[in-house]
C-alpha cells in the first residue's frame, strides 16, 4: 500500500506544479489516460482475489477519485486565472481627458433642461415625479380617462395602434401622459401630488407638431382641491419658469374628457418682436390646459368622487421650450444637428435650481 501513497503524493505535486491548461492536461493523461499510472493499477483489479479487491482495490479507486478531483479543481483554477489575465490584458480606459476648449464640450438638450427646470419648480412645491410605459392599453389611454367610444382620438389617423394580440387587444403608443394618473391612483392612496414628464405620440408633423413629442402634466388629489388651487399653482409655476415677477393669466372654458370643468389657460405677453416676452404686453398666448378631475376618472382610479376631488393640468414641453428660448421650429429638436445643439444647448454643470437660477 506504500507505493499507492507515494504515487498519490507524486501526482498531487505534479497537479500543484501545473501552471496552465496544457500542463494540467499532460498530468491528467499521465495519470488517468489509457496508459496512465493510475489506469494501469485499475487494470489489475480483475486479477485480484475478492479479499484483496476489498482492500487494495478500494485504495486504488480512492486514489483515482482523489487524483481526478485534484486535477478538475486545478483545471478550473487555471481556467479562471487565464480568463482574469486575458481581461486584464484587454482592459480599455473608457475615461476621456478634460476637453481644453469650451467649444468642444457637450451640451444638454433643451428638453432635458426644461424637464430639470420644471422638476425644480414643482419639487419645491412638494410634488414628486411619476412615470409610466410608452406603450399603453386602450383601457389606460382612453377608457379609464373617460374617452367614449367613437372619440376622434381613438381613430387610426390620430393614434399609433399596434397589431391586435392573441386576445384581440390593440395596444397604442400613448397619446398623452395621462394614463399615469390612473396607474398612480391605483397604486397610491391620497393625498397625491405628482408631475408626469414623458414622451407622447400622435400622427402629426409640421413646424409646431411632431409624431413624437414631450408632455408634462400634474395631478393633485385630496379632499379639498379646488379651482383656486389650480390658479395659484399655475401662476406660481409661470412666474418662476418664465422668470418674471408677475403674470396675468386667463382661464377660458373648454372641454377635455378627463376633466370637468375644463379650461384652456392663456398668459399675457408681448409678441411684437422675434422673441415672446412674458409678464408684459397686451397679447395673449395659450400655454396649457387644465381642469378638475372628472368623477369617472376618479372611479376608474379606485377613488370615491364623493370623498376625493382633484385637479390636473398638462402642457407640451417642446412648445414651452420654444416659447422660453426662442426656437422657431419643433422639428429641429430631433434632427441631431450639432450646430443647433451648440447654439441652443446648455452647459452640463449648470443644473437649474430655484436659488441658483433656472436658465444659466
From Swiss-Prot:
Location of this chain's protein in the cell: Cytoplasm
Keywords: Aminoacyl-tRNA synthetase, ATP-binding, Cytoplasm, Ligase, Magnesium, Metal-binding, Nucleotide-binding, Protein biosynthesis
PROSITE patterns the UniProt entry points to: AA_TRNA_LIGASE_II (PS50862)
GO BP annotation list: phenylalanyl-tRNA aminoacylation
Binding site for Mg(2+): 260
Protein name: Phenylalanine--tRNA ligase alpha subunit
Cofactor-binding details, from the entry: Binds 2 magnesium ions per tetramer.
Essential cofactor(s): Mg(2+)
The family this protein is said to belong to: Belongs to the class-II aminoacyl-tRNA synthetase family. Phe-tRNA synthetase alpha subunit type 1 subfamily.
EC number: 6.1.1.20
Reactions that this protein is recorded to catalyse: tRNA(Phe) + L-phenylalanine + ATP = L-phenylalanyl-tRNA(Phe) + AMP + diphosphate + H(+)
Main location per the UniProt record: cytoplasm
GO CC terms, sorted: cytoplasm
UniProt keyword annotation of Magnesium present: yes
GO MF terms held by the record: ATP binding; magnesium ion binding; phenylalanine-tRNA ligase activity; tRNA binding
Pfam families in alphabetical order: Phe_tRNA-synt_N, tRNA-synt_2d
Coiled-coil stretches noted in the UniProt entry, renumbered to this chain: none
Record's subunit section: Tetramer of two alpha and two beta subunits.
SUPFAM superfamilies named in the record: Class II aaRS and biotin synthetases, tRNA-binding arm
Amino acid at each position: 500500500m506504500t507505493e499507492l501513497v507515494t504515487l498519490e503524493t507524486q501526482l498531487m505535486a505534479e497537479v500543484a506544479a501545473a501552471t496552465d491548461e496544457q500542463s494540467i492536461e499532460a498530468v491528467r493523461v499521465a495519470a488517468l489516460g489509457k496508459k496512465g499510472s493510475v489506469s494501469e493499477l485499475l487494470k489489475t483489479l480483475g486479477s485480484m482475489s475478492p479479499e484483496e479487491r476489498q482492500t487494495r482495490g478500494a485504495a486504488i479507486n480512492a486514489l483515482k477519485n482523489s487524483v481526478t478531483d485534484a486535477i478538475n479543481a486545478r483545471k478550473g483554477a487555471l481556467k479562471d486565472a487565464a480568463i482574469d489575465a486575458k481581461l486584464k490584458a484587454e482592459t480599455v480606459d473608457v475615461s476621456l481627458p478634460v476637453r481644453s476648449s469650451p467649444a468642444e464640450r457637450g451640451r444638454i438638450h433643451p428638453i432635458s433642461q426644461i424637464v430639470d427646470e420644471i422638476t425644480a419648480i414643482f419639487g419645491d412645491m412638494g410634488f414628486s415625479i411619476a412615470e409610466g410605459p410608452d406603450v399603453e392599453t386602450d383601457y389606460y389611454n382612453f377608457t379609464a380617462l373617460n374617452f367614449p367610444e367613437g372619440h376622434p382620438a381613438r381613430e387610426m389617423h390620430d393614434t399609433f395602434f399596434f397589431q391586435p394580440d392573441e386576445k384581440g387587444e390593440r395596444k397604442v403608443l400613448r397619446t398623452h401622459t395621462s394614463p399615469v394618473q390612473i396607474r398612480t391612483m391605483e397604486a397610491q392612496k391620497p393625498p397625491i401630488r405628482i408631475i408626469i414628464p414623458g414622451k407622447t405620440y400622435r400622427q402629426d408633423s409640421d413646424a409646431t407638431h411632431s409624431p413624437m413629442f414631450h408632455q408634462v402634466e400634474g395631478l393633485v388629489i385630496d379632499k379639498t382641491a379646488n379651482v383656486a388651487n389650480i390658479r395659484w399653482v399655475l401662476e406660481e409655476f409661470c412666474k418662476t419658469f418664465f422668470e418674471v415677477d408677475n403674470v396675468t393669466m386667463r382661464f377660458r372654458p373648454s372641454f377635455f374628457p378627463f376633466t370637468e370643468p375644463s379650461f384652456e389657460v392663456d398668459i399675457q405677453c408681448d409678441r411684437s418682436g422675434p422673441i415672446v416676452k412674458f409678464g408684459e404686453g397686451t397679447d395673449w398666448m395659450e400655454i396649457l390646459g387644465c381642469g378638475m378631475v372628472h368623477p369617472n376618472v376618479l372611479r376608474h382610479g379606485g377613488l370615491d368622487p364623493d370623498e376625493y376631488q382633484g385637479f390636473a393640468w398638462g402642457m407640451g414641453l417642446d412648445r414651452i421650450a420654444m416659447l422660453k428660448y426662442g426656437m422657431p421650429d419643433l422639428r429641429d429638436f430631433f434632427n441631431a444637428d450639432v450646430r443647433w445643439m451648440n447654439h441652443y444647448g446648455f452647459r452640463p454643470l449648470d443644473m437649474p435650481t430655484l436659488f441658483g437660477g433656472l436658465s444659466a
